[in-house]
């Protein structure tokens, strides 16, 4: 299995958010039935420390903005948000600005909007699972299987979590469409 262990990715995001000063987080999940996204949120709170605080924001950008703004208004002590997807992160950023809150924003996955938010400082980091590796590594495994007496790796091959932030966004963005 090649991929990103979502619970571990969330945990690493929570640990980093905690190290960056977050004390009261909120996880925005656009697909509450999607166990991978729930794992991201549960992992975030495992790393951050504290009880799970996850809301279903739907996949509709207007709903994401409205529900995020409502959550921030209802609990001004929220100082960290993890968005479980890139479009959620962009909508959360707008809600944070609309409410006038100061909130540490972290994301999952890459998009043009997330790239811009990392460059501007609106988002602290995103977790990149390197989708190209998820497609490339199985080819290598199949080649080895066919040329090495049917031998397979003994464990999962993680492609993430990897952090993208202001320190490496330009390098990562330059690889978009080539190696990422």
Q: For each of these PLM feature ranges, what is it?
A:
Residues 44, 53, 57-117:
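Hydrophobic alpha-helical
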Residues 1-25, 62-65, 111-114, 129-149:
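Hydrophobic alpha-helical segments within soluble ligand-binding/sensing domains
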Residues 24-32:
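Short beta-strand segments enriched in small/hydrophobic residues
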